[in-house]
Amino acid sequence: MVKVLFETAVGFCLFNVSDSSKLEATKNLHESLDSAEGASNLLKLSAIHRFTNTAEAVEDISAINEGKMSKSLKKFLTDEIVEGKGKEKENLIVAESKLASNIAKKLGIQVTYDSELLDLYRGIRENLATLLSSSSGDESLDPRDLNTMSLGLSHSLSRYKLKFSPDKVDTMVVQAIGLLDDLDKEINIYAMRVKEWYGWHFPEMGKIITDNLAYAKVIRAMGFRTNASATDFSEILPEEIEETLKAAAEISMGTEISETDLEHIWSLCDQVISITQYRTQLYQYLQNRMAAIAPNLTALVGDLVGARLISHAGSLMNLAKHPASTVQILGAEKALFRALKTKHDTPKYGLIYHSSLVGQAPQKLKGKMARMVATKAALSIRLDALADADTKSDEGAPTVGIEARAKLESRLRALEMQSGLSGMRSARNAAGDQGHKQKGFQMEAGGRSYNAAADAAGPSDMASAANMAPSMLPSTPAKPSTTTDEEKKLSKEERKALKKARKSEIAASEPATPAAASEAGDDKLSKEERKALKKAKKDANGVETPKKEKKDKKKRSADEADVNGTPKSEPGSSKKKKSKKD
C-alpha cells in the first residue's frame, strides 16, 4: 500500500493511493489529477492529525520546511504506520528529501522521495478541499473553514520567518524623533513670541526666569504685573526667584496692556504649556521604544542619539549594515563631501558627537573617543538588529552596551591621565627642568669657524691688513688669494697687470704711518708678507717720482735765474729748440 504524507493548515493528512501504477507513469499523472473527480478516484483520505492551535501548526510546518520531524508528526506516523497492520508492505511518499531520510532513519519504514512526483502534490493542493470534504466521519471539513485556517497559518508562518515583533517596529522611532525635533522648534518659536509680547509689560521678567515652561505658567498665574505681590508662585518657582520677581514687578519699567492683550497672551501661554507637556510624554514614549528596539545602542550612546542614528539610516537593519567608520560620520555628509571636494581633512564625527562619552572628552581626545564609540556602537547595533525579540526582552539584555560603555569610560580616564602627564612633561621641558634625562648634543654658536670671505682678498682687504696693528695680525702665513672666474679667462700678462694695479691702489690709499711703527710691524710679519708690502710701496713711489722731479727742476731753474739775473725761459722755447734739433 502506497501512502502520501501531506501537510495542511488543518493538520497532517495521509492519503491512500488507489492505483499505484499511475504513479509510475509520471508523464500522464497530471491528467489524472486535473479534475476533482479524478483526484477523488486516485486518492482517499486515510488519517488526519489536527493541530490544536496556531503555535503548534507554525512549529510543525517550520520543522517540515527545515527537513525535521516534529514530535506530533512522529507520534502520528507511529500510530498510523508503524503500529498499524501491514508495516512491511506500506510505502510512504513525502515531498522533502531530508524529511524522507529522517523518517526512514528514526521509524525504520520505507520512505520514497521523487522529484518527478511533484505533479502529485500539485494535484492534491488544487483539490484539497474536495478531498477533505468527500471524506466521511469526523474527518469532514468545510472548504470555507479551510481557507480561513490557511490564511491565518500563512500570516503566522510569515511572522515567524521574519521574526516579527510589534515592539521591534523601528518606524515608530523614526516618526517619534522627527516629531520631537519639530516640537522643540515650535516650542522655541512660541516661547520667544510670548517673551517678546509680554516683555512690553514686564521686561525684567525675561532675565529672571529663563525656563520657557515656567515663564508661561507664571504669566498664566499672575496676569498683570501688579498682581505679582498677591500671587503664590511656590509651585512654579523657587523661593529666591519668587522674591526677586516680586521685587522687580514693583519697580518695573514696562508699559501698561489691556485685558484683550492679556487674553491673547494667555492663549499663547496655554499653547506653550500644552505642547511642552505633550513633548514630555513623547520623550517617555521614545525612551520605552528605544529600550525595546535597541537596548544596547541606547545604553551606549543614549536614546536621543540612537534614535537619530536610526532615523538617519532609515531603519535599524540599514544602520546595522553600515561599518563603524560610516556610523562615526553619519550626519556629517555635507562636511565630508566638501572636504573631499576641496581635498581638506575629513570630519571626525557626526551625530555621535552629541553622545555623553564624546561630549565629556577633552577637545584633543574627541576624535579618538568618537572613533572608539562608533566601533562599539556598530557591534551593539548589529546585536540589536539581528537578535531575537525574546532575547532582548530579558533583564540582562543590554549587557553588551553596558560593558562597552564601562570599558570606554575607563579608557577615557586613562587617556586623560596620559594627556595630563604629557602636559606636565612638556611644561617641565619648557621651564628647563629635564630631570635625570641626559641632554642631547647640540651645536652651539660662538666658537671659531672657517671664514670663507678670507679666500678672496680685494683692495679694501689689503688696505685693512696693512693698517692692522701687529697684535691683531694672524700668526700663521696668509694663504695666497684665489683668482676669480673672470681672472682665469684672462691671459697671464693681463692678470699680472691687474695685480700691479691693485697693489698700487692699495699703496696710494695707505695713510702715512711713523717709520718706527712700520718697522715694528714689519718685524712681526712673515717674510712673504714683508716682501709683498715692500713691492707695493716701491710701485707706489715709482708712479709718483717723475712728477715730483719735474716740479723740483722747475723750482731750481727759477731760483738760479733769479740769482744770476737771467730771464725766465718760456715754455714754448724749449719745444722750438727741440723741434729744430729734430
From Swiss-Prot:
Domain Nop residues, every copy: 293-417
PROSITE patterns the record matches: NOP (PS51358)
Main location: nucleus
Localization of this protein: Nucleus, Nucleolus
Superkingdom of this protein's organism: Eukaryota
UniProt feature, compositional bias: Low complexity: 507-519
One Pfam assignment: Nop
Example GO BP: box C/D sno(s)RNA 3'-end processing
Region listing for Disordered, in residue ranges: 461-582
Keywords, alphabetical: Nucleus, Ribonucleoprotein, Ribosome biogenesis, rRNA processing
Residue stretches of biased makeup (Basic and acidic residues): 485-496, 521-531, 538-549
Keyword Ribonucleoprotein (UniProt): yes
One Gene Ontology cellular component: box C/D methylation guide snoRNP complex
InterPro entries referenced in this protein's UniProt entry, alphabetically: Nop56/Nop58 (IPR045056), NOP58/56_N (IPR012974), Nop_C (IPR042239), Nop_dom (IPR002687), Nop_dom_sf (IPR036070), NOSIC (IPR012976)
Family in the record: Belongs to the NOP5/NOP56 family.
PANTHER family per UniProt: NUCLEOLAR PROTEIN 5 NUCLEOLAR PROTEIN NOP5 NOP58 (PTHR10894), NUCLEOLAR PROTEIN 58 (PTHR10894:SF1)
Protein name as it appears in the record: Nucleolar protein 58
Taxonomic path: Eukaryota, Fungi, Dikarya, Basidiomycota, Ustilaginomycotina
Record gene name: NOP58
